[in-house]
Amino acid sequence: MTRIGTPLSPTATRVLLCGCGELGKEVVIELQRLGVEVIAVDRYANAPAMQVAHRSHVINMLDGAALRAVIEAEKPHFIVPEIEAIATATLVELEAEGFTVIPTARATSLTMNREGIRRLAAEELDLPTSPYHFADTFEDYSKAVQDLGFPCVVKPVMSSSGKGQSLLRSTDDVQKAWDYAQEGGRAGKGRVIIEGFIDFDYEITLLTVRHIGGTTFCAPVGHRQEKGDYQESWQPQAMSPIALAESERVAKAVTEALGGRGLFGVELFIKGDQVWFSEVSPRPHDTGLVTLISQDLSQFALHARAILGLPIPLIRQFGPSASAVILVEGQSTQTAFANLGAALSEPDTALRLFGKPEVNGQRRMGVALARDESIEAARAKATRASKAVVVEL
């Protein structure tokens, strides 16, 4: 039975969030609504989730000793990783010592590294995936490309948001894709995965929540990527009943193997009735931002309920809905957003501005949300709202 105490008192239920981006911010807001005391930790000050938490700490998230020191001082009831770039070995140790990691330390560890999760899905669970090789050297990588043929995809085994990812179409791309992968890895230069290209019709994120009452799926989320980064998403993605059932089977197998409680974003490729597993995040997913307008319980509310052991009897979906990101390019520590009245002038629209403290290059700084009579209309409306926002650097 779940019992939640009073924040900032001896009875408080404490959650420590590792990583404080826009997804973490929404998780914190949902936890705050349930009277949870939230401590936010990231590598830079004034990160979005820190702005809505009770207090925060700035540390190098890959420094196991620093992470342990904060967790031992705060004594949280739940440790909730929101990003991949964390000292996962320390989380494994802390879990063994009695701390609760969401969903589990093993899930966080396996999914930080594309190799761990790919081998689990393809080799242990025997799920359909693209053909793949791993390589540590340019020589092995070149052999793998030759073996898989063109087109193929290369990614660092440890990276996020599409960093270091390339689609190779010919021998001209081999060297530059290798160089880009070496720059884009979270832990610096190193191992890459080379995947055969699947000629899919579309890709989806199946938001899958493991909670006290079992496993529940949100309606499938379709999305469009550019250079591995999400640009827009929509829900529900139209699918055949066979493809949807197979997607749910694959998502359930992967999330069951990872264990624990919480929301998972399972990425899948779909061609007709065929489904291939791509990746999984053991936390809310950027493409799932659409659920802020498309569902009565957003992915963030679902994650909060699952963490706290609260039931999820039903997820109500409101019909065709879409999200379109607000990308900012340039350099600023005082970005402002104008023309918001025009952006919100149509019915069934909403904005989320993330409050990120700076932009240096290109950064996702907000998202526009919309509902309409069809997916096409909802996507167009969300895009209009996003484009209407005027960014002042």
Curated annotation (Swiss-Prot):
Residues annotated as binding N(1)-(5-phospho-beta-D-ribosyl)glycinamide: E22, L23, E82, D286, K356, R363, R364
All copies of domain ATP-grasp, residue ranges: 119-308
Disulfide-bond pairs as recorded: none
EC number assigned by the record: 6.3.1.21
GO terms, biological process: 'de novo' IMP biosynthetic process
Catalysis performed (reactions): N(1)-(5-phospho-beta-D-ribosyl)glycinamide + formate + ATP = N(2)-formyl-N(1)-(5-phospho-beta-D-ribosyl)glycinamide + ADP + phosphate + H(+)
Pathway the protein contributes to: Purine metabolism; IMP biosynthesis via de novo pathway; N(2)-formyl-N(1)-(5-phospho-D-ribosyl)glycinamide from N(1)-(5-phospho-D-ribosyl)glycinamide (formate route): step 1/1
Gene3D superfamilies: 3.40.50.20, ATP-grasp fold, A domain, ATP-grasp fold, B domain
Residue positions binding Mg(2+): E267, E279
Binding of ATP, residues: R114, K155, S160, S161, G162, K163, G164, Q165, E195, G196, F197, I198, E203
Keywords assigned by UniProt, alphabetized: ATP-binding, Ligase, Magnesium, Metal-binding, Nucleotide-binding, Purine biosynthesis
A single GO molecular function term of this UniProt record: magnesium ion binding
GO terms under cellular component: cytosol
Pfam families the UniProt entry points to: ATP-grasp (PF02222), PurT_C (PF21244), RS_preATP-grasp-like (PF22660)
Record bears the keyword Lipoprotein: no
HAMAP family tied to this protein: PurT (MF_01643)
Functional description taken from the UniProt entry: Involved in the de novo purine biosynthesis. Catalyzes the transfer of formate to 5-phospho-ribosyl-glycinamide (GAR), producing 5-phospho-ribosyl-N-formylglycinamide (FGAR). Formate is provided by PurU via hydrolysis of 10-formyl-tetrahydrofolate.
Family: Belongs to the PurK/PurT family.
Oligomeric and partner information: Homodimer.
Protein name in the entry: Formate-dependent phosphoribosylglycinamide formyltransferase
Gene name in the database record: purT
